[in-house]
Structure formats: C-alpha cells, structure tokens
C-alpha cells in the first residue's frame, strides 16, 4: 500500500478515465484541446505517458496505491469485522470464490473516492463503454459531477463484458445498435448518436485522397 495524508483539491471541466495506451490518449486530443488542457484531467491505468504529453494533467491509477490513509484504515477495519464474513458466506452458498470480486469493488471505491473527492469535474468520459463502474459513477456524482459518459467503442455483442453498463449518457455510433445494452441490464439515461471517434481520428483527420 502507498498512502497519502494531505488532500489537495482541484477543479476541472472534464475527467477522461480509463486511458490505457498512448494511441488512446491521441484519440482524445481534439476533445482535450476543445475544453483546454488545463481544464481536463486524464486518468491512466497502470502506465505513465506524462513524458509524451508533458503539458497535460495526468493521474495514474495502480491497485491499492495513492489512497488516503484514513479511508484505507476505515475500509480495512470494516472488511475485517463485517465484509470478509459476508463474502465468505456468499462464496460458500454460491460455490464461487467472490473474494476477487470484492477486492475489485473495494479498490474501485477507494480509488474513486480519492480521485473525485479531490479532483472535482462537471463531466466524466471514457472510451471503453464496457468498463463502466456503478461505484465509480455514484462517487463521481456524490462529489459534484453532473454526468458520467462514454463513447460507444464498438458494436454491443452477446458477451458478458457488455452486461450491466452504467452511464448517464452514451455517445453511440448511430441511432440503433444499442438496445442490447438495455436488455442486458444496463442503465443508460440518454443516448446521443455522434458517430465513431475511431473513424474520426483514423480516417477523417488524415485527409486520405481516394483515386476515382
């Protein structure tokens, strides 16, 4: 565990979450420039790209790191006396090891609480609509966020990763093709067709000349 004691509060207009590669970061550059670099926080997962984008605001998420000490101690206390026994009972009843799931939920809660309590923003967006997290979205709204959003990266297939999406706004590829997400138990309050961010960065912005 790597913990922090001092809380430094910052304000942004937009937080871009779950950035996992330099290529993905490049796709967001136009949106970041629209808001202004100083008004956007980019959250990466287990890797650093600050050297490539030195004038952007970054925060790197690593499991159970950069958490606030008192939040961590409180969580450990509650889990030792209550949570661990609930998870153990459910694991026995279902014959499924639920401890990895519980650890993931705890990590999401602690990191999201630290992130949003000290980095307040109006909007939250991510590229991978299948990695939305209800706990994260709840805490984002609790600490003053207006809307958690995501682009639609690809078609919604019959796969478990597309189950139970949790979003205020989905920026969809088109006017259809997203009903499966609702049927799979997802919460999407508003669907706004905008097209493909991948197509924009990978095709339209490159000005290809097509010979007729």
Predicted regions and their residues:
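Catalytic-core helical/loop segments in enzymes performing group transfer/polymerization on anionic/lipid-linked
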Residues: 1-212
């Amino acid at each position: 565990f790597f913990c922090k004691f001092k809380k430094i509060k910052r304000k942004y207009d937009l937080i871009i979450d779950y950035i996992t590669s330099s290529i993905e970061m490049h796709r967001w550059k136009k949106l970041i420039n629209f808001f202004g670099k100083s008004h956007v926080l980019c959250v990466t997962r287990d890797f650093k790209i600050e050297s490539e984008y030195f004038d952007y605001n970054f925060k790197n998420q690593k499991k159970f790191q950069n958490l606030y000490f008192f939040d961590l101690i409180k969580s450990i206390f509650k889990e030792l006396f209550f949570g661990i026994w609930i998870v153990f009972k459910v694991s026995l009843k279902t014959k499924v090891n639920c401890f990895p799931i519980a650890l993931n939920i705890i990590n999401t809660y602690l990191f999201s609480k630290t992130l949003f309590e000290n980095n307040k923003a109006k909007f939250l967006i991510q590229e991978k609509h299948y990695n939305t997290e209800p706990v994260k979205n709840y805490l984002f709204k609790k600490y003053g966020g207006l809307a958690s959003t995501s682009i639609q990266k690809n078609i919604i297939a019959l796969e478990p990763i597309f189950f139970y999406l949790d979003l205020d706004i989905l920026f969809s590829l088109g006017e259809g093709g997203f009903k499966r997400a609702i049927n799979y138990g997802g919460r999407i309050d508003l669907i706004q067709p905008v097209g493909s961010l991948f197509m924009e960065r990978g095709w339209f912005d490159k000005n290809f000349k097509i010979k007729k």
